[in-house]
Amino acid sequence: MDVRRADERYPGGDEAAGIASRHAFSFGPHYDPDNLRFGALLACNEERLAPGAGFDEHPHSHTEIVTWVVEGELTHRDSAGHETVVRAGDVQRLSAAGGVRHVERNDAAVPLTFVQMWLAPQEPGGEPAYEIVRGIADSTPYAVPAAGAMLHVRRLAAGERTAVPDGAYVYVHVVCGGVRLGDAELGAGDAARVTGARGLTAVGVTDAALLVWEMGDV
């Protein structure tokens, strides 16, 4: 198990523009040839946007982009004609495929926090696609078949335990609270990268929320 602490993430964003970002993998100007991906996962970015802040229209291609809103509301508009407001507990997926442009903003009067994760598709190209799942339940894994991956959202009370899925590559990101994963204790913003995961259990040290990626061989 490879544990990465919250303070090891690369800082990003633009504080003057109301954007604070933390990147778990190489991203933008922060290049680390030894930290480009884990399994299909290319990025795990925690984004905090002040009211009125956001990312102007920008392009993506050949990427599966999955977003989970922690608090606040994320306004999304893209060149394929989708316009939605993504709220806390919602999962959003944008398949960039051969190419798409989008805007992401906090048009609400309260701060916005979301975790955005990028995955490499098994086959490049195709047509862009968009989906949103409102208030996804813990018992409902979210499949990203183009990347051979499955997202599990886990919300734990203190002392509660949950099985971590087995997989060739399993990535556990702690959104908030504290958990014990095997022999490791993880806090908010920490992550664990597990190769060949088998029989792992996560236990809430406090009330906690986790995002767990189950991925196959790449």
Positions of predicted regions on the chain:
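A short, N-terminal "cap"/entry segment at the start of jelly-roll beta-barrel domains
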Residues: 1-51, 55-56, 83-88, 101, ...
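Short beta-strand segments
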Residues: 44-45, 69, 95, 118, ...
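Short histidine-centered beta-strand/loop micro-motifs
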Residues: 53-60, 77-78, 103-106, 161-166, ...
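Glycine- and acidic-residue-biased ligand/ion/polar-headgroup-sensing regions
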Residues: 61-80, 88-91, 166-182, 188
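Short acidic-glycine-tyrosine-enriched beta hairpin
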Residues: 80-95, 135-137, 161, 180-204
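Ligand-binding loop in jelly-roll beta-barrel domains
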Residues: 81, 96-127, 195-218
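Strongly charged, low-complexity linkers/loops
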Residues: 141-168
